[in-house]
Amino acid sequence: MRRQVTLCYLAALFVLAGCGGNSGSATLKVTRDRGQHVLLVARIPAGLTAMQALERKAKVTTSYGGRFVVAINGLASAPHHDWFYFVNGVEADRSAVEVRLRGGDTEWWDYRAWTNPNAPQGAP
């Protein structure tokens, strides 16, 4: 009986180790005006940082040593307008170079005014 419990425990660990993490893929979405205009949607491999994923699918201009996105595909920050990003509907609290994507994640960049800190309409 003890051996069966141990085997079941080990099997559960192997199954859980395969969930999410660096396996599978994530989704990258780039929009403007709180999600009203979709500019890009792409699948990306899990395990990349949010910045690596964005740079694989779009032309990105950064500042502050590559930690802050200034422009995506030529759409650049302007007075009172910037790029904001979310992972799974939650606004990021750190640079995209520090956030590693897991399988099933949605990375969403939205170009918008600073007037409302809420997530874009239709956030995942």
Model-derived regions: residue spans:
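Sec-dependent bacterial lipoprotein signal peptides
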Residues: 1-18
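Ubiquitin-like/PB1-type beta-grasp interaction modules and other compact soluble beta-rich domains
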Residues: 2, 18-124
